[in-house]
């Protein structure tokens, strides 16, 4: 299969995974923990869709490189992968999330609570997202070995 087809599948899988996962988890955090109204949360989630479409593949590449880097250092591959997913998710998503909340008119207190809550919850969410991303990549038949090769091109 040509590298372009692998790349397109990878982009599509990463985009589908990020849009679905961030919509569901973001709305839960915003409404349950950050005390945002349904309207504010829905506005935030709708604004996040085009943002997530733009950042999905760069995040996938960022995450894959962090996972590959940390896997070189550790003997516990499962634990290292989970730690890499946690770090990648929090470090990449928190600034993007804060910008989205600011853009929809959340006040500073709501932004701090939402981003802070999300960072704490991301200790679990980032790991779960890593598994969800791998599942979506599997559904789109993105081979594991080719993802590393494509990411380095």
From Swiss-Prot:
Ranges annotated as spanning the membrane: 16-36, 42-62, 86-106, 114-134
Keyword Transport part of the UniProt annotation: yes
Extent of the signal sequence: none
Membrane topology of this protein: Multi-pass membrane protein
Cell compartment(s), UniProt: Cell inner membrane
Keywords linked to the UniProt accession: Amino-acid transport, Cell inner membrane, Cell membrane, Membrane, Transmembrane, Transmembrane helix, Transport
GO molecular function, one term: L-amino acid efflux transmembrane transporter activity
GO BP annotations, alphabetical order: amino acid export across plasma membrane
Transport keyword on record: yes
Cited InterPro entries: Ala_export_AlaE
One Pfam family matching this protein: AlaE
Task of the protein: Exports L-alanine.
Record protein name field: L-alanine exporter AlaE
């Amino acid at each position: 299969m040509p590298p372009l087809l692998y790349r397109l599948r990878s982009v599509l899988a990463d985009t589908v995974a990020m849009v679905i996962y961030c919509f569901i988890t973001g709305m839960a955090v915003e409404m349950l923990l950050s005390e945002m109204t349904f309207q504010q949360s829905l506005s935030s989630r709708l604004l996040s869709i085009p943002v997530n479409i733009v950042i999905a593949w760069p995040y996938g590449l960022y995450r894959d490189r962090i996972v590959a880097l940390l896997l070189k250092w550790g003997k516990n591959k499962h634990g290292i992968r989970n730690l890499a997913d946690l770090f990648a998710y929090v470090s990449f998503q928190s600034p993007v999330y804060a910008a989205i909340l600011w853009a929809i008119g959340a006040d500073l207190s709501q932004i701090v609570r939402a981003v802070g809550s999300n960072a704490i919850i991301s200790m679990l969410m980032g790991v779960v997202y890593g598994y969800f991303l791998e599942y979506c990549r599997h559904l789109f038949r993105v081979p594991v070995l080719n993802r590393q090769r494509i990411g380095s091109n």
